[in-house]
Amino acid sequence: MIGLINGQVQYLMAPTACVMTTSGVGYDIELPLPSFCQLRLNEQASIWTHFHVREDAQLLYGFIDRKERDVFRQLIKINGVGAKMALAMLSAMSAAELKMHVEQDSEDALTRIPGIGKKTAQRLLIELKDKLKNIEVDSSHLEFAMQPAPISAEGSIIAEVEGALISLGYKEREAQQAIKAAKSNGETFADTQSLLKATLQQFQSFK
């Protein structure tokens, strides 16, 4: 089983990154958006991974923080929560935020995540209480770090962010509305990561 990959980031297309190790092997890894936003093209990265096997594919999911991977593994143990939904949950909020919402029985916070309705949220709150209570996540920073990244054309940035959100389960209209709201104050975004961060924050104000 592949548990940790160290290498140079060769390619970034949210939510997938390709990381090449010193042996010359490149691994395509899907990451929750907060982890994805910490990667930089052509820079070194250490990514904790979960190897996921389906009938039609073998996939690697990656996380900057090992505890985030622990939370992901607990999520996919729950009946009805697949890897895609777990990735969407950890894209909509950090592992620390998820644990906080579970401890506070915050049903509304979970229903903001694409694919999670009221009944599913209620069931998740019950099942996650025991699963997450022994996982110590870093709650000192609920906002993920952002650094300047190479400039891309604005149209490409918007298209990439929209595609990333849709791949995680958001509807096209929801993704477009969130992007529009993020840009409503006239701010310009020079890179995908900064627009992703601003767009994800908009979902917190929806519903």
UniProtKB/Swiss-Prot annotation:
| Keyword Repeat included in the entry's annotation | no
One MF term in GO for this entry?
four-way junction DNA binding
Q: Which region ranges are annotated with the description Domain I? A: 1-64
Extract one GO BP annotation from the record.
Answer: DNA repair
| Chain residue ranges for the region called Domain II | 65-143
**Pfam families cross-referenced by the UniProt entry:** HHH_5 (PF14520), RuvA_C (PF07499), RuvA_N (PF01330)
Q: Where is the signal peptide?
A: none
Subcellular location, record wording: Cytoplasm
Keywords on this record? Cytoplasm, DNA damage, DNA recombination, DNA repair, DNA-binding
Q: Where is this region: Domain III?
A: 153-207
Location (main, coarse): cytoplasm
Superkingdom, according to UniProt? Bacteria
Gene Ontology cellular component? cytoplasm; Holliday junction helicase complex; Holliday junction resolvase complex
Domain observations: Has three domains with a flexible linker between the domains II and III and assumes an 'L' shape. Domain III is highly mobile and contacts RuvB.
- Describe the subunit structure: Homotetramer. Forms an RuvA(8)-RuvB(12)-Holliday junction (HJ) complex. HJ DNA is sandwiched between 2 RuvA tetramers; dsDNA enters through RuvA and exits via RuvB. An RuvB hexamer assembles on each DNA strand where it exits the tetramer. Each RuvB hexamer is contacted by two RuvA subunits (via domain III) on 2 adjacent RuvB subunits; this complex drives branch migration. In the full resolvosome a probable DNA-RuvA(4)-RuvB(12)-RuvC(2) complex forms which resolves the HJ.
Quote the protein name from its UniProt record. Answer: Holliday junction branch migration complex subunit RuvA
Q: Which gene encodes it?
A: ruvA
